[in-house]
Amino acid sequence: MSKLQILEFPDPRLRTVAKPVQTFDAALGQLIDDMFETMYEAPGIGLAATQVDVHKRIVVIDVSEDKSEPMVFINPDIEVLDGDPEEMQEGCLSVPGFYESVTRIPHVKIRAQDRNGESYEMEARGLLAVCLQHEVDHLNGKLYVDYLSNVKRTRIRKKLEKQHKMRA
């Protein structure tokens, strides 16, 4: 396994809409394993392939405290079920060091495929529902900062650009 480089906002590659996965092979399995390693080391609870400059519809998530519930969602499709939108603090491995309130639906159904191409569906609530929506947004070229005001988004972008220049 190997750790992958995570793209950071405002990198334009984060705006690429991911394409469906067609081939379920050993290379896909290796990518998924590398994504989990990258997510756990970051540390984070979710990672979309777009964030590591692979523009395929793949998401890995583990919202457990002890990294014991790794979940893979390939070609995910989310359906909003019910509940009033709720505000929750979100962070993102592609927007390091920033946490902002975002409004999301707390109960969703997701249809996806596993690493072998088998289709499945499940319902998700709370943190898992929020994480799924956040990661699927990445696959569609959208970031959580897009839900913020222009003022907040610009402030975050400028701070991250300054950090990038200092590292270069």
From Swiss-Prot:
Keyword hit for Nuclease: no
Record: active site: E135
Gene Ontology terms, MF aspect: metal ion binding; peptide deformylase activity
This protein's UniProt keywords: Hydrolase, Iron, Metal-binding, Protein biosynthesis
Cofactor(s) it depends on: Fe(2+)
GO BP: co-translational protein modification; translation
Record Pfam families: Pep_deformylase (PF01327)
InterPro entries documented for this protein: Peptide_deformylase, Peptide_deformylase_sf
Ribosomal protein in keyword set: no
EC numbers, comma separated: 3.5.1.88
Cofactor: how and how many bound: Binds 1 Fe(2+) ion.
Catalytic reactions of this protein: N-terminal N-formyl-L-methionyl-[peptide] + H2O = N-terminal L-methionyl-[peptide] + formate
Chain positions recorded as Fe cation binding sites: C92, H134, H138
Function: Removes the formyl group from the N-terminal Met of newly synthesized proteins. Requires at least a dipeptide for an efficient rate of reaction. N-terminal L-methionine is a prerequisite for activity but the enzyme has broad specificity at other positions.
Family recorded in the similarity comment: Belongs to the polypeptide deformylase family.
NCBIfam families: pept_deformyl, PRK00150.1-3
Name of the molecule in the record: Peptide deformylase
Organism of origin: Hahella chejuensis (strain KCTC 2396)
Gene giving rise to this polypeptide: def
